[in-house]
Every structure is written in C-alpha cells, then in structure tokens.
Amino acid sequence: MNTLYLGSNSPRRMEILTQLGYQVVKLPANIDETVRQNEDPARYVQRMAEEKNRTALTLFCETNGTMPDFPLITADTCVVSAGIILGKPHSQAEAIEFLNRLSGKQHTVLTAVCIHYRGNAENRVQTNRVVFKPLSSEEISAYVQSGEPMDKAGAYAVQGIGSIFIQSIEGSFSGIMGLPVYETVSMLQDLGYRTPPFIRA
C-alpha cells in the first residue's frame, strides 16, 4: 500500500495527496494555534507543524500501542502582510480586515511541513509571494458573504473564488493551498519512503 497518515482536517491537503495516488488516513491534531508575542512567522508555522505532528503521533501511539507503520504528515500555513501574521479569520469583520490589508499589495504565504517516519523527522518551511489586485469594498463584501474566506489562512482560497484577486504568484501553487508537493515528496524520499505511486504505474 501507498499509505500516508495526515494530521490535518484540511480537505485541500487531503486532495493534494490523494491526487498523487496515496491512500490517506486522517488523524486528529488539534492544538493551540495562538501566535506568541514577537514570534517570527517562519518559526511560527514550523512550530505549528511540529506540534501537530507530536500531538497526532502521541494520540496514535496511545490508541494503537505502537508507532505508525507509514509516514505521518502535518503542515501549517500562514499569510504574512507587512510582518503581521494573518491566520484564519474568526469573524466576517476580521475577514474584511484581512482582505483590505491584502488589497493591491504583495504578501507572503508560508507553509511548514513536518513528516515523521520510523523514528526520524524532517521539517521544511516553503515560501511564496502573492500579489493581489486592488479590491473594492463591494468585491470584499461579496467574497466574505460567499463564506469561502472563513476557514482559510489570510481569508482567501487560491484554488477557489479568491483566485480572481490574484495578479501574480511567485512560488508553489500547492504550497499556497497548504501542502507544497515538491518539498513534501522530497522529504518522503529523504526519509526512505516510496516515491508517489503514479511513478511506477
């Protein structure tokens, strides 16, 4: 089997891995995602991915009495605008605030990936730069009313309606979605796990 454990509830991360041909088993990895005072954004996403991995791994071991037979992947994504971390908005008002902040400017999207396999772990942070067109208040209001921004870092989905706001991307589309494919597969290979199933099809 080409099985992976995914410590995430993100349908986007699940979609990315299943498209590569992996059988994905979801594990809960609920943690406190509060940003520490003056915490560096790259360190923040790395810490989140690592804490999710530890949480999911501990729960798996407690439930099954053994370590996972397959790699456990966790990830975290944040949007950074002018040095300020924009996570998932907690309200429509906050989503509007985030989108006004991103309007007409460049921002950074950081995604950290942590993989644990057979007692070894790999961690990487992948960086992307995105430029938004200037947004009108009507566009922002209509987008927020669609509901799409409410469970997305930075209050937009690169693969959804939010794509109409994007002028340019420098980096990885899948990384902005929440799981950079190139880095993730490279980490799996470095840990000695099999290449994506489609390669041997």
Swiss-Prot record:
Q: Name one Pfam family in it.
A: Maf
Recorded protein name is dTTP/UTP pyrophosphatase
Q: What's the source species for this entry?
A: Neisseria meningitidis serogroup A / serotype 4A (strain DSM 15465 / Z2491)
Which InterPro entries did the record assign?
Answer: ITPase-like_fam (IPR029001), Maf-like (IPR003697)
Q: Which family does it belong to?
A: Belongs to the Maf family. YhdE subfamily.
User: Molecular function terms in GO for this entry?
Assistant: dTTP diphosphatase activity; UTP diphosphatase activity
Q: Where are the transmembrane segments?
A: none
State the source organism's domain of life: Bacteria
